[in-house]
C-alpha cells in the first residue's frame, strides 16, 4: 500500500505532467483563462488518463509485448497507433457523455475536448507506463495521479490568470508573455519536490 501512495504522490507533485515534463502545454495554456473551464477540462483529463493508462497496459501486456500472443513475435512496433486508437475511443465516449449530460461544460471546452485525443500528456502517461514497466494496479494509480497533477497545475494557473486580469501588467507582457513567466515560476515551485525521496 505504501508503494502505491508513494507512486500517487510522485505522479502528482514530483513528476507533474505539466510542470515537470511540460506535456499538454497546448490545452494547458489555451484553456487556463477561467477556473471553471480549467476544472472541467482537468476532470476530463483525469478521467481519460485514469482509464487510458490501465487499458493500454492491458493492450500492451496481452497483445503487443514481446511474446504476449505467440512466443518470439514482438508487436511493440504497433504501440503508437494502438495507444492513440484507444485514447481516441475513450475521448469520443467522454465527448458524447459530456454533450448528453453536461452541455454547458461541453460548449465551454469547445474544440479542446477532442484535442485531448492528441494531448501529449495523455500519450506521455501511457508511454511512461510502458517505459517504467508498471503493472495493472500501478498503472491505475499512475494514470489517476498524473491526471490529478495536470488538473492541479491548470486550475492553479487559471486562478492566477484570473487574478492577473486586475493587475498592472506591462503592455509588452500582456497575454501569453506573462502566462509563460507564470508557468515558469510555477514549474520552479514544483521543481522543489524533485529532491523528495519516497
UniProtKB/Swiss-Prot annotation:
Coiled coil: none
An example Gene Ontology biological process: respiratory electron transport chain
Intracellular or extracellular location(s): Cell inner membrane
Keyword Membrane: yes
A GO cellular component annotation in the UniProt record: Gram-negative-bacterium-type cell wall
Bilayer topology: Multi-pass membrane protein
Keyword Protease appears in the UniProt entry: no
TM region positions: 11-31, 39-59, 77-97, 110-130, 140-160, 176-196
Gene Ontology molecular function, alphabetical: oxidoreductase activity, acting on NAD(P)H, quinone or similar compound as acceptor
EC number(s) per entry: 7.2.1.1
Pfam families recorded: Rnf-Nqr
Alphabetic keyword roster: Cell inner membrane, Cell membrane, Ion transport, Membrane, NAD, Sodium, Sodium transport, Translocase, Transmembrane, Transmembrane helix, Transport, Ubiquinone
UniProt-listed InterPro entries: NqrDE/RnfAE, NqrDE/RnfAE_oxidrdctase, NqrE
Catalytic activity, reaction form: a ubiquinone + n Na(+)(in) + NADH + H(+) = a ubiquinol + n Na(+)(out) + NAD(+)
HAMAP family: NqrE (MF_00429)
Subunit structure: Composed of six subunits; NqrA, NqrB, NqrC, NqrD, NqrE and NqrF.
Family: Belongs to the NqrDE/RnfAE family.
Function in brief: NQR complex catalyzes the reduction of ubiquinone-1 to ubiquinol by two successive reactions, coupled with the transport of Na(+) ions from the cytoplasm to the periplasm. NqrA to NqrE are probably involved in the second step, the conversion of ubisemiquinone to ubiquinol.
Protein name: Na(+)-translocating NADH-quinone reductase subunit E
Species annotation: Aliivibrio salmonicida (strain LFI1238)
Amino acid at each position: 500500500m505504501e508503494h502505491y501512495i508513494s507512486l500517487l504522490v510522485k505522479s502528482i507533485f514530483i513528476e507533474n505532467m505539466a510542470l515537470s515534463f511540460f506535456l499538454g502545454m497546448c490545452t494547458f495554456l489555451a484553456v487556463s483563462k477561467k477556473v471553471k473551464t480549467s476544472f472541467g477540462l482537468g476532470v476530463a483529463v483525469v478521467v481519460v488518463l485514469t482509464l487510458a493508462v490501465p487499458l493500454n497496459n492491458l493492450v500492451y501486456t496481452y497483445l503487443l509485448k514481446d511474446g504476449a500472443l505467440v512466443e518470439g513475435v514482438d508487436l511493440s512496433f504497433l504501440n503508437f497507433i494502438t495507444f492513440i486508437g484507444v485514447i481516441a475511443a475513450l475521448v469520443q465516449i467522454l465527448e458524447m457523455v459530456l454533450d448528453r449530460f453536461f452541455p454547458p461544460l461541453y460548449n465551454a471546452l469547445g474544440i479542446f475536448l477532442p484535442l485531448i485525443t492528441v494531448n501529449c500528456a495523455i500519450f506521455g502517461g501511457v508511454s511512461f507506463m510502458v517505459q517504467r514497466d508498471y503493472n495493472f494496479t500501478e498503472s491505475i494509480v499512475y494514470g489517476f495521479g498524473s491526471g490529478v497533477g495536470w488538473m492541479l497545475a491548470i486550475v492553479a494557473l487559471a486562478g492566477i490568470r484570473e487574478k492577473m486580469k486586475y493587475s498592472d501588467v506591462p503592455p509588452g507582457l500582456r497575454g501569453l508573455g506573462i502566462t509563460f513567466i507564470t508557468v515558469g515560476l510555477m514549474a520552479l515551485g514544483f521543481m522543489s519536490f524533485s529532491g523528495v525521496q519516497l
